[in-house]
């Protein structure tokens, strides 16, 4: 399923515009924060596609029925650029497991490149939903 977040007007357009704006993107903290915000928005949209289970919680006024995510979520990212985006996902999927890939482009003299993977840190994905959070 393909879902383009900025196809409809929303605050996402502001985040994308600031990340693309040459004058603004030099502010590394703002750039990282906008990446984190994009991770949050993306996590919210992905949450709509997950499986849910009805549960009951005890409130100060009694019991309330709520639907909660039943999928076990693993959020994976490519180090380093993806870390703020990854954090945005964790802000919403705070009980998710994490996975990391250390990779970079290794360029040859002709300008072509190969992806060099140094390591992957990931537990078992059996029966889990993997979200590859790579901006």
Give short role names for the model-derived ranges:
Residues 1-134:
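PRPP-associated nucleotide enzymes
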């Amino acid at each position: 399923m393909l879902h383009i977040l900025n196809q409809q007007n929303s605050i996402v357009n502001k985040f994308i515009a600031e990340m693309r704006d040459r004058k603004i993107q030099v502010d590394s903290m703002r750039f990282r924060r906008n990446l984190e915000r994009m991770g949050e928005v993306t996590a919210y949209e992905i949450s709509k596609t997950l499986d849910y289970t009805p549960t009951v919680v005890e409130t100060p006024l009694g019991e309330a029925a709520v639907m909660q995510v039943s999928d076990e979520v693993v959020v994976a990212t490519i180090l380093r650029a993806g870390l703020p985006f990854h954090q945005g996902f964790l802000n919403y999927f705070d009980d998710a497991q994490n996975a990391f890939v250390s990779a970079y482009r290794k360029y040859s003299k002709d300008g072509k490149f190969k992806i060099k993977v140094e390591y992957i840190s990931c537990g078992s994905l059996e029966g889990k939903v993997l979200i590859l959070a790579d901006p």
